[in-house]
């Protein structure tokens, strides 16, 4: 299974009342697949999965699937710290005809490496849906070790990993221990180029909401052997990469999309909207990069109001 190069970790739009805005989700999904995204990851960290109900997630999977209409991969965030829940959600995503599932390392209960292996193996054996593992120890409290990844990669449906530990030695070891067809995706926009240099496949991106085509150019330049050009793209985009993590993701990206006119709404509690100095820094970076001149979101807002 080839998920592509640029996979957007899609935000979940909410109404002013805090309910899911499925109409805006469909619009955003359509926009993303025509602006550089090979795939969409729905209901991941950026999609605020911890504060969504399963029923909200299932409906969002369906809405995004229909909006994409086969033009890009749709990967469902069906991970959980309950193995049983993760299996049930993954089966549902398969029934909905999605292209893959993102399985986060179980959080809070801190299983051992043996427990992690059994967790992911059980999910893999319960469904034919291709699985992308998701290692993000800064949020989960436990890290999936390269040796465990290599063992899991022997299972037919476990085809890739989103690596968000920020540890390049771990990425190197995963690449060394896994077959070449096993996909390694950067979980941080700013580490896309370094991970490409270690045999990575692409990125699960937040910034691609705003600069999808540029990220495609970065990765394609590297793939063509034009490493200097890839570095130029990386350095040009680097201030945006950092600004989008000035506070907890997805708070900054939702603020940026609202500035562009998208009706994505605020984050759900316990997250709070971007304010004060952070908001000013983000706005300045967007202005300097010409991203507030984008008319797509504002045009939709005007059309909706009329």
UniProtKB/Swiss-Prot annotation:
Keywords: Amino-acid biosynthesis, Cytoplasm, Diaminopimelate biosynthesis, Lyase, Lysine biosynthesis, Schiff base. GO terms for cellular component: cytosol. It catalyses: L-aspartate 4-semialdehyde + pyruvate = (2S,4S)-4-hydroxy-2,3,4,5-tetrahydrodipicolinate + H2O + H(+). The keyword Ion transport does not apply. SMART domains: DHDPS. The active site is at residues 134, 162. SUPFAM superfamilies: Aldolase (SSF51569). InterPro entries: Aldolase_TIM, DapA, DapA-like, Schiff_base-form_aldolases_AS, Schiff_base-form_aldolases_CS. It comes from the Bacteria. Its main location: cytoplasm. The keyword Cytoplasm applies. Pyruvate binds at residues 46, 204. Homotetramer; dimer of dimers. Belongs to the DapA family. This is 4-hydroxy-tetrahydrodipicolinate synthase. It comes from Synechococcus sp. (strain JA-3-3Ab). The gene is dapA.
């Amino acid at each position: 299974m080839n998920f592509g190069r640029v996979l957007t970790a899609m935000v979940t739009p909410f109404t002013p009342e805090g309910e899911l805005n499925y109409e805006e989700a469909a619009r955003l999904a359509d926009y993303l697949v025509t602006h550089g995204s090979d795939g969409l990851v729905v209901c991941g960290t950026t999609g605020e999965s911890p504060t969504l109900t399963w029923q909200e997630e299932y409906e969002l999977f369906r809405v995004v699937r229909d909006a994409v209409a086969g033009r890009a991969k749709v990967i469902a965030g069906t991970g959980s710290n309950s193995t049983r829940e993760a299996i049930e959600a993954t089966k549902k995503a398969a029934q909905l005809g999605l292209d893959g599932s993102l399985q986060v390392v179980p959080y809070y209960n801190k299983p051992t490496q043996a427990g992690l292996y059994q967790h992911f193996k059980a999910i893999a054996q319960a469904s034919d849906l291709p699985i992308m593992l998701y290692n993000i120890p800064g949020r989960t409290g436990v890290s999936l070790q390269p040796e465990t990844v290599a063992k899991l990669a022997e299972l037919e449906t476990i085809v890739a990993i989103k690596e968000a530990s920020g540890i390049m030695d771990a990425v190197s070891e995963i690449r060394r221990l896994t077959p070449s067809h096993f996909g390694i995706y950067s979980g941080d926009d700013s580490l896309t180029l370094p991970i490409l240099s270690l045999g990575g496949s692409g990125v699960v991106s937040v910034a691609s909401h705003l600069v999808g085509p540029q990220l495609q150019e970065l990765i394609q330049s590297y793939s063509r052997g034009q490493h200097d050009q890839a570095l130029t793209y990386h350095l040009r985009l680097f201030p945006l990469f950092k600004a989008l993590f000035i506070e907890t993701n997805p708070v900054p990206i939702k603020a940026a999309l609202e500035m562009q006119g998208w009706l994505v709404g605020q984050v759900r509690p316990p997250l709070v909207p971007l304010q004060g100095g952070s908001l000013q820094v983000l706005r300045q970076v967007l202005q300097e990069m010409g991203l507030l001149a984008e008319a797509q979101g504002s045009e939709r807002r005007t059309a909706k109001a009329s």
